[in-house]
């Protein structure tokens, strides 16, 4: 019981299994689930990238995203620019993405997180703006602590309703992050520009 209490206090995941379950089978199953989840995340990321670069295909994309997102709900895009990120190799980019994504575990709605056009992109679906701002604030502080030598800029787009409008939130986030980079602000909300 002491171990369970300690793990709960530290927010450390504890896996308990019955004795008859073989650890090798459990690890294999868990690994397969992780691989499948990563593949699904990559496909969703590609769909959002397509939506941003080819908005005329939004109806086709809408059909493909229906299983994972409420396409009639609200969408909001956040762009995260990190100083000199254009010089990151794939391993460094993956390491930074992992650090950023640790902060998103509290998001209880559908979201996508990926690298696109020089920025880390977070697309959230049906998430209250106050909760998003709290998560972004936590992520910013954590990133500054983990990477003190790099300046981080955030651009937060407007919350839009329906998948058709996600491109507008993306463009507004891009304008906001561009302003943040230009004036050396850590964070700019499009609505406050």
Language-model features, listed with the residues they occupy:
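Extracellular/luminal Protease-associated
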Residues: 1-18
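An acidic, carboxylate-rich microenvironment
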Residues: 2, 25, 165-168
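Proline- and acidic/polar-enriched loop/turn elements at helix boundaries
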Residues: 18-19, 192
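Charged, low-complexity surface segments at secondary-structure and domain boundaries
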Residues: 13-14, 33, 84
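Short, hinge-like loop/turn segments at secondary-structure boundaries
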Residues: 6-8, 31-35, 171
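Hydrophobic helix-rich structural segments at or within alpha/beta enzyme and signaling domains
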Residues: 44-193
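An acidic- and aromatic-residue-enriched active-site/binding cleft used to recognize and process polar
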Residues: 19-20, 159
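Juxtadomain coupling helices with adjacent low-complexity linkers
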Residues: 23-56
């Amino acid at each position: 019981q002491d171990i369970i209490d300690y793990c709960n206090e530290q927010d450390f995941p504890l896996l308990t299994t019955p004795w008859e379950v073989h650890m090798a089978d459990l690890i294999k199953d868990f690994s397969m689930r992780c691989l499948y989840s990563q593949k699904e995340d990559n496909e969703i990321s590609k769909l959002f990238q397509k939506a941003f670069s080819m908005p005329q295909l939004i109806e086709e994309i809408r059909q493909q995203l229906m299983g994972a997102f409420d396409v009639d709900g609200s969408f909001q895009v956040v762009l995260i620019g990190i100083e000199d990120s254009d010089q990151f190799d794939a391993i460094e980019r993956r390491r930074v993405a992992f650090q950023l994504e640790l902060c998103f575990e509290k998001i209880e709605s559908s979201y996508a997180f990926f690298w696109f056009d020089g920025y880390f992109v977070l697309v959230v679906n049906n998430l209250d703006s106050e909760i998003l701002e709290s998560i972004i604030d936590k992520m910013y502080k954590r990133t500054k602590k983990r990477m003190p030598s790099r300046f981080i800029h955030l651009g937060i787009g407007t919350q839009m309703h329906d998948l058709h409008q996600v491109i507008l939130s993306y463009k507004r986030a891009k304008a906001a992050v561009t302003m943040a980079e230009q004036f050396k602000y850590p964070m700019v909300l499009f609505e406050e520009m």
